[in-house]
């Protein structure tokens, strides 16, 4: 059984979906998030450590993100880290989506993505953007299925947008 207070340093919202699933919304704890990113680095289509400064990323996510954590049967199953601080543009940005290997195939990313979309609506944001590789077919198709459209395609690296 996980302690959500180890994962999130602040909890803004709690959505109990059923007796086995809860989505928590808040700021990720720095130590947890860094450990999580490094532990799951090779799960990403292109490992994060090879393309970003992990410490700077962890600090930015801790400081600026709204993170959605799905807990299923007492275990952290996945998360989405997003930014909703650009009030003038009314545009959010998903910076990281991840479902732990042992929880894949259960449509948990769909649950998290719907929570992010509902959050955007609730704070009157008009758009959510994200970057994804077309070759990362599971992620690319997930976003298409949930109404994201390709805005730009730079050699297979796509900027996608969802509009409320």
Predicted regions and their residues:
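Acetyl-CoA-dependent GNAT
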Residues: 5-95, 100-101, 113-114, 119, ...
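Conserved glycine-rich acetyl-CoA-binding loop
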Residues: 100-111, 123, 134-141, 145
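Short loop/turn motifs at secondary-structure junctions
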Residues: 93, 124-127
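A generic secondary-structure micro-motif detector
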Residues: 47, 106, 128-129
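Short C-terminal domain-edge/linker segments immediately following a structured domain
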Residues: 54-56, 111-113, 125, 159-163
């Amino acid at each position: 059984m996980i302690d959500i207070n180890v994962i999130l340093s602040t909890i803004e919202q709690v959505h109990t979906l059923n007796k086995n699933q809860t989505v928590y919304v808040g700021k990720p704890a720095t130590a947890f998030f860094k450990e999580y990113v490094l532990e799951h680095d090779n799960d990403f289509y292109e490992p994060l450590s090879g393309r970003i400064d992990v410490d700077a990323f962890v600090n930015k996510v801790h400081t600026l993100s709204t993170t959605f954590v799905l807990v299923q049967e007492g275990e952290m199953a996945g998360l989405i880290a997003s930014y909703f601080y650009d009030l003038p543009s009314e545009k959010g940005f998903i910076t990281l989506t991840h479902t732990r290997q042992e929880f894949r195939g259960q449509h948990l990313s769909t649950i998290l993505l719907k929570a992010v979309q509902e959050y955007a609506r609730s704070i009157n944001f008009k758009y959510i953007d994200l970057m994804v590789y077309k070759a990362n077919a599971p992620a690319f198709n997930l976003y298409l299925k949930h109404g994201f459209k390709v805005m730009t395609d730079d050699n297979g690296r796509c900027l996608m947008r969802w509009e409320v």
